[in-house]
C-alpha cells in the first residue's frame, strides 16, 4: 500500500480503532480482492472501499499494489 501525503494525513485524523479497521480492510482487499468495493464513474480506474462511515479512494496497479488517494468520512467523500 502506498499512501499519498493527503491520504496519510486523512488517516492520522481518524480515531485509532477506525483507522485500524480501514487498514485491515485495505490489506484484506490487497491480498484477496474481497471487500465492499465499487468502481467509481469516469475513466480513471479509481476504486472506492467502504469501511463503516469511511470511504477510501484508491487505484490498484499492478494487482495487489494499492495507491491510496483519500480516506474520507462519507459526508465528505462524494462532494
Positions of PLM-derived features:
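A short, surface-exposed loop/turn module that caps and links secondary-structure elements
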Residues: 24-49
Amino acid at each position: 500500500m502506498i499512501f499519498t501525503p493527503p491520504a496519510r494525513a486523512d488517516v492520522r485524523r481518524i480515531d485509532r480503532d477506525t483507522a485500524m479497521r480501514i487498514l485491515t480492510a485495505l490489506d484484506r482487499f490487497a491480498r484477496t480482492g474481497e471487500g465492499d468495493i465499487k468502481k467509481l464513474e469516469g475513466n480513471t480506474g479509481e476504486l472506492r472501499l467502504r469501511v463503516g462511515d469511511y470511504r477510501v479512494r484508491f487505484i490498484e496497479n499492478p494487482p495487489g499494489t494499492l495507491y491510496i488517494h483519500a480516506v474520507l468520512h462519507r459526508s465528505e467523500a462524494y462532494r
